[in-house]
């Protein structure tokens, strides 16, 4: 498991700003190199920067890939079938975790997973 320090900032981050903009240049970069075992051997280069202001957290992903797919457009649709990134946040003292997934078009899927035990219908409790 990778650990990453999320820098605290004074106010909301501009998520429309460029990767190297003043808003983001001081945020630590983490290289994402964990891929699901059932994925193909094709692994694009992925980096992420994150920040928080005490009220929310903000992230930018940078993906370098020559093959992309972007079909899902509805909130909470199956973006995992598209070119996507995902990350997980475990709240302190809480049960479970938040699962965020974004496709390359910006469509988001978000679940709060209380029990990640796999069943034939997905997770046991989400």
What are these regions (language model features)?
Residues 1-126:
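Structural preference for beta-rich elements and adjacent junctions enriched in aromatics
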């Amino acid at each position: 498991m990778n650990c990453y320090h999320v820098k605290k900032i004074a106010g909301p981050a501009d998520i429309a700003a460029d990767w190297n903009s003043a808003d983001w240049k001081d945020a630590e970069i983490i290289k994402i190199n964990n891929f699901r075992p059932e994925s193909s051997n094709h692994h694009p280069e992925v980096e992420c920067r994150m920040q928080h202001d005490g009220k929310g957290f903000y992230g930018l992903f940078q993906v370098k890939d020559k093959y992309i797919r972007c079909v899902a457009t509805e909130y909470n649709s199956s973006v995992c079938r598209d070119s996507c990134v995902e990350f997980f946040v475990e709240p302190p003292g809480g049960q479970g975790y938040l699962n965020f997934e974004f496709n390359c078009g910006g469509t988001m899927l978000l679940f709060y997973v209380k029990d990640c035990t796999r069943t034939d219908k997905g997770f046991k409790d989400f």
